[in-house]
């Protein structure tokens, strides 16, 4: 499972002109699921995400988590995180989990974030989404959990 975490002051997901998810200060998470991922992997990644100290304290040091700042999360499914571009000019996505499995584990990840005490807003799985965000920093972290 692979997550790209972006520290944001705000983020919004729109599908067909309708806002489907948004957050104020917190994290925009792009989540990719691999075929070998499990609910346990989703839970471990959610725990790491919730506790990762990438928000500044009073001294300007990255010493606070999204939980510590009372921030929210906008979670977006993103199979393209498993793109393979080693051969040719067109990416292959065979390293991504099949849609049914990815949907299940995307849901498990979001529920695990909620169990950590986070307010989680979601995109629409499999839809064409338009994301509007304001990066804070910018701070962008990639997490891979085997």
Curated annotation (Swiss-Prot):
It is an enzyme of class 3 (hydrolase). GO terms for molecular function: D-tyrosyl-tRNA(Tyr) deacylase activity; Gly-tRNA(Ala) deacylase activity; Ser(Gly)-tRNA(Ala) hydrolase activity; tRNA binding. A motif (Gly-cisPro motif, important for rejection of L-amino acids) lies at residues 137-138. GO terms for cellular component: cytoplasm. Pfam families: Tyr_Deacylase (PF02580). One of its GO terms (biological process) is D-amino acid catabolic process. It is found in: Cytoplasm. Its EC number is 3.1.1.96. Its main location: cytoplasm. An aminoacyl-tRNA editing enzyme that deacylates mischarged D-aminoacyl-tRNAs. Also deacylates mischarged glycyl-tRNA(Ala), protecting cells against glycine mischarging by AlaRS. Acts via tRNA-based rather than protein-based catalysis; rejects L-amino acids rather than detecting D-amino acids in the active site. By recycling D-aminoacyl-tRNA to D-amino acids and free tRNA molecules, this enzyme counteracts the toxicity associated with the formation of D-aminoacyl-tRNA entities in vivo and helps enforce protein L-homochirality. A Gly-cisPro motif from one monomer fits into the active site of the other monomer to allow specific chiral rejection of L-amino acids. HAMAP family: Deacylase_Dtd. Homodimer. Belongs to the DTD family. This is D-aminoacyl-tRNA deacylase. It comes from Deinococcus deserti (strain DSM 17065 / CIP 109153 / LMG 22923 / VCD115).
């Amino acid at each position: 499972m692979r997550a790209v975490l972006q520290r944001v002051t705000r983020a919004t997901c729109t599908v067909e002109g309708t806002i489907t998810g948004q957050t104020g200060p917190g994290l925009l998470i792009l989540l990719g699921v691999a075929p070998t991922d499990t609910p346990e992997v989703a839970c471990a990644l959610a725990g790491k995400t919730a506790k990762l100290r990438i928000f500044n304290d009073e001294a300007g040091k990255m010493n606070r988590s999204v939980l510590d700042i009372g921030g929210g999360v906008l979670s977006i499914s993103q199979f393209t995180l498993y793109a393979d571009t080693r051969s040719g000019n067109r990416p292959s996505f065979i390293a991504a989990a099949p849609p049914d499995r990815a949907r299940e584990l995307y849901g498990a990840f979001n529920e695990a974030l909620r169990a950590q005490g986070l307010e989680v807003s979601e995109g629409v799985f499999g839809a064409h989404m338009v994301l509007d965000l304001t990066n804070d920093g910018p701070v962008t972290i990639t997490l891979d959990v085997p």
